[in-house]
Amino acid sequence: MINPNRQIVLDTETTGMNQLGAHYEGHCIIEIGAVELINRRYTGNNXHIYIKPDRPXDPDAIKVHGITDEMLADKPEFKEVAQDFLDYINGAELLIHNAPFDVGFMDYEFRKLNLNVKTDDICLVTDTLQMARQMYPGKRNNLDALCDRLGIDNSKRTLHGALLDAEILADVYLMMTGGQTNLFDEEESVESGVIRVMQEKTAEEIKSAVDFSHNLKLLQPTNDELQAHLEFLKMMNKKSGNNCLWDKRFGNNNVH
């Protein structure tokens, strides 16, 4: 059963990937990094492990993540950590940037051990790259670009590393979806300042409080901007279990 309040932001590094056929075939996971969020708050219950592969890493892959064969020589094999890893992610929503890459590798590793399990069977997988593409159509949406766009410090990211990338992705995800505090937590956020004002005041009261005497220029969104906004509201409404406050307060019939 999926726990909707528990999210694990996950990243992997590998020995390489294939340009043709299955991208994972013949390769191995060599690092897993994961950051746990419960009710959109960091718990500190993170996971990080290096794994000894059964083959050398490709030189091009080493240039990306900097993990050499010598660094992995004394690390456990995947079969030694597989069950603990499965227990850790079981029942969570996995947040992964370009999820098909990592999930493909994870399921491949499970199959090599004859484990009768697929990631989708025990987790809800959310691809944050697809989320970003919906929110920022036509723009670059890799982690570096998103950090620049959202004002997140990624200065420590000189090489790819699974735990560091998971930590950065957690920051990116929370910024893309409204911040660390859950907007829809009845006991905390709904009682907080801005949202409480939105609950107590009607749309007419808010409108009447605005001074229109200064002849401010009214900026209209483009069709592309409006569509991106609607897609964002759809995503927020889905994430909140159909509790999108914009929809509830102002009767936005476009959010479903």
From Swiss-Prot:
Keywords assigned: DNA replication, DNA-directed DNA polymerase, Exonuclease, Hydrolase, Magnesium, Manganese, Metal-binding, Nuclease, Nucleotidyltransferase, Transferase
GO annotation, biological process: DNA replication proofreading
Note describing how the cofactor binds: Binds 2 divalent metal cations. Magnesium or manganese.
Gene Ontology cellular component list: cytosol
InterPro entries hit by this protein: DnaQ (IPR006054), DnaQ_proteo (IPR006309), Exonuclease_RNaseT/DNA_pol3 (IPR013520), RNaseH-like_sf (IPR012337), RNaseH_sf (IPR036397)
UniProt: substrate binding residues: D11, E13, D60, H65, D165
Active site: H160 (proton acceptor)
Residue positions binding a divalent metal cation 2: D11
Gene3D superfamilies from the UniProt entry: Ribonuclease H-like superfamily/Ribonuclease H
Catalytic activity, as annotated: DNA(n) + a 2'-deoxyribonucleoside 5'-triphosphate = DNA(n+1) + diphosphate
Domain of life assignment: Bacteria
Enzyme Commission code: 2.7.7.7
Enzyme class: transferase
Stored Pfam families: RNase_T (PF00929)
Function comment: DNA polymerase III is a complex, multichain enzyme responsible for most of the replicative synthesis in bacteria. The epsilon subunit contain the editing function and is a proofreading 3'-5' exonuclease.
Protein name: DNA polymerase III subunit epsilon
Record organism: Haemophilus influenzae (strain ATCC 51907 / DSM 11121 / KW20 / Rd)
Name of the gene this protein is made from: dnaQ
